[in-house]
A protein has these predicted regions:
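Short amphipathic alpha-helix
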Residues: 21-22
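Short N-terminal binding/cap micro-motifs at the start of the first secondary-structure element
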Residues: 14-18, 43
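N-terminal beta-loop-helix "entrance" segment that forms/cooperates
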Residues: 36-55
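Active-site-adjacent pocket-lining segments in enzyme domains
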Residues: 3-10, 14, 25-37, 55-56, ...
Length: 187
């Protein structure tokens, strides 16, 4: 079985639940998930002031990963969009039909990069007006073409399972072990 890899982006102001939980779930599925930061300082500070040590500094190495993940956070989208090298990397992933995943405000970053054009996507409440090039779907997680999107801080589980699905990974055993259905999962 192929070993997949995921590059999860982290920038100051990231939404902790959307970032840490995704890394955890993907690693449980056997995905080599690494967090990437945009500064030399190894610790990135989340929205709730949680300091998380990122694995690596953002570089061209990200292009070697099977999927790039853009979590949300109120102040993150503008920072990601302002980073030309990062935006070019998203465009490169899209042009090369590699998997791109974004949730919450991260979906607006995908929109700004032109990744969502003509694809079904979802995002945070009220983002239908922001994701204008996409066909907006009111669902917790959506997979279309080479893009996975999700709504917000309470949806990392369905988001991670959609990423697994897109990679061809059966997440049902993980779902069972984590008691997702017993906890009321509806994805």
């Amino acid at each position: 079985m192929k070993k997949y890899s995921a590059a999860v982006m982290m920038i100051d102001g990231f939404e902790e639940s959307e970032t840490v939980q995704i890394i955890d779930l993907l690693r449980r599925a056997g995905v080599e998930a690494h967090s990437f930061r945009f500064q030399e300082e190894p610790f990135v500070v989340g929205m709730q002031n949680l300091k998380v040590k990122a694995d690596k500094v953002f570089s061209e190495e990200v292009k070697n990963y099977d999927v790039i993940v853009v979590p949300g956070g109120r102040t993150c989208a503008a920072k990601f969009i302002a980073n030309e090298e990062f935006m070019n990397t998203l465009k490169w992933f899209n042009e090369n039909n590699k998997l791109i995943a974004g949730m919450c405000s991260g979906t607006t970053v995908l929109e700004a990069a032109g990744v969502l054009a003509g694809k079904k996507a979802t995002g945070y409440t009220g983002y239908e007006a922001k994701l204008i090039s996409a066909e907006f779907v009111h669902d917790v997680a959506v997979y279309d073409a080479n893009v996975v999107t999700s709504q917000g801080p309470a949806t990392p589980y369905p988001f991670a399972f959609k990423i697994m699905e897109a990679l061809g990974i059966d997440g049902s055993e993980i779902e069972k072990r984590l008691l997702c259905r017993e906890a009321g999962a509806r994805w």
